[in-house]
C-alpha cells in the first residue's frame, strides 16, 4: 500500500513491534536533543552568556546537531517518550535519561512565564498585561494539540498576570473547547507591558520588531523571544529582550 504512494523508498521492518519502536525512538531522540538545549540555556543564563551565540559558534563544527531551546508539544515528540518509558517500566526497567529530559521540557513553559514575571516586577513592580503571540504547538500549522503555550498562560495567570493571546492560524472555537481560553485578533490586542513570541509563525517574523514593538504600551517594553527568531541587531534600543 505504502509503495503505491511513497516515492522515497520503503524500509521493511521485520515486525510491527520493531516499526513502532523505531517511530517512538525517533521522537524520543528529538525530545532529548531539545531537552539538552533547554538545560544548556539554563546553564548559559547562569553564566550570563547568550545561548544563541554559543550554538552559532558550535554549529561551525561539521557534525554539531542543530537543535535550539524551546517548548515541546504536539501529539508526537512530547507524548511518545511516555509510551516508551511506560513499556520499559512494565518490562522491569526504569528509564532515567528519557524521564529527565521530559522533566526539563515539561518545565520550560513555566520557566518562560517566571522570566516574564521577573522582568515585569523589575521594570514596573507589578504584573501587568502580557500579550502571547502563538497558541499552536509549533510554527506555521493550525494544530493546537498538546500545545505547551498553555503552560506559559497558566503560570502567568497563577501569579495574577492578565494575559491576551493571538494566533492567526489557530481556530478560536477549538482553542476555547480544548483549553478554556479565548483568542484575540491581533488588531484588537490592547497595548501590553510585555510580549511573548511563543510560536514564531512566519506572519509574526515578517512583521519583525515593528510588529512586536507596536503591541507594547511603551517603547521600552519587555519582549521574550522563545525560539530566538527576532534579529537582535535591529532590536529597538529601549526594548528589554529575553532569550532562553
Provide a role label for each language-model segment.
Residues 1-244:
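Structural/interface elements that position substrates and couple domains in central-metabolism enzymes
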